[in-house]
C-alpha cells in the first residue's frame, strides 16, 4: 500500500513520501494560481478553483487568499462560501454541507500527530475527517480540530476552538467550544 493510499484510508502515513510530496507539489502550483487570479474574472476564477478543489459544487465560492494541503480531499456543497484567509489541512478529508458560511481566517485541520514524543519525531501523521453540516455558520477565526463533526444549522462563534462534536441546531462558542443554547 502506498503512503497516499494509507492517507486516503485514514491510516498513519509518511507525509514525506514521494507520492504524498507530489500531491503537495500539485497543490502548491494550483494554490498559487488560484490566489493570483482575480475574483472578478469569473471564468479564470472558476477554472483555478476547480483545479485546486475538484470536488465542489459549481456555486461554492472561496475568497482568496486560501491555503490547503492537498485540495482533492475537500468537498464543498451547493452555495458554500469561504471568506478570505482560511487554511484547510485536508489529509483526512473535509466535507462542508450546502449553504454553509465560513468566516475569514478560519482553520480546519484534519492532521493528528502521535502523542508519544519519540513517535512524533517520525514524519508520520493520521488524518481524521471533519464534517460540517448544511446551513452552518463559522464566525471569523474559528479553529476546527481533527475528527470533529458540526451538526446542520449550527453557529460557531468567532475565535472558537472546536475540539469535540457539536450537535445540530446549536449555538456554540469558546475555547474549548461549548454549546450555549439550542437554535431550534
Q: What are these language model-derived features?
A:
Residues 1-59, 176-180:
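Terminal amphipathic alpha-helical/low-complexity segments used for targeting or macromolecular assembly
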Residues 66-76, 81-150, 170, 175-184:
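Flexible, glycine/small-residue-enriched loop-and-beta-strand segment within the central core
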Residues 149, 163-164:
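Active-site/ligand-binding-proximal alpha/beta "capping" segment
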Amino acid at each position: 500500500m502506498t503512503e497516499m493510499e494509507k492517507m486516503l484510508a485514514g491510516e498513519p502515513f509518511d507525509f514525506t513520501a514521494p507520492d504524498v510530496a507530489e500531491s503537495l507539489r500539485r497543490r502548491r502550483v494550483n494554490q498559487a494560481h488560484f490566489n493570483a487570479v482575480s475574483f472578478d474574472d469569473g471564468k479564470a476564477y472558476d477554472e483555478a478553483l476547480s483545479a485546486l478543489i475538484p470536488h465542489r459544487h459549481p456555486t461554492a465560492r472561496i475568497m482568496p487568499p486560501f491555503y490547503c494541503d492537498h485540495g482533492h480531499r475537500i468537498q464543498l456543497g451547493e452555495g458554500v462560501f469561504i471568506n478570505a484567509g482560511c487554511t484547510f489541512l485536508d489529509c483526512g478529508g473535509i466535507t462542508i454541507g450546502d449553504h454553509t458560511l465560513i468566516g475569514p481566517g478560519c482553520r480546519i485541520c484534519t492532521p493528528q500527530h502521535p502523542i508519544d514524543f519519540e513517535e512524533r519525531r517520525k514524519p508520520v501523521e493520521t488524518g481524521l475527517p471533519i464534517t460540517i453540516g448544511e446551513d452552518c455558520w463559522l464566525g471569523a477565526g474559528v479553529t476546527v480540530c481533527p475528527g470533529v463533526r458540526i451538526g446542520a444549522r449550527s453557529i460557531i462563534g468567532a475565535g472558537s476552538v472546536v475540539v469535540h462534536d457539536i450537535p445540530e441546531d446549536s449555538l456554540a462558542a469558546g475555547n474549548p467550544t461549548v454549546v450555549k443554547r439550542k437554535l431550534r
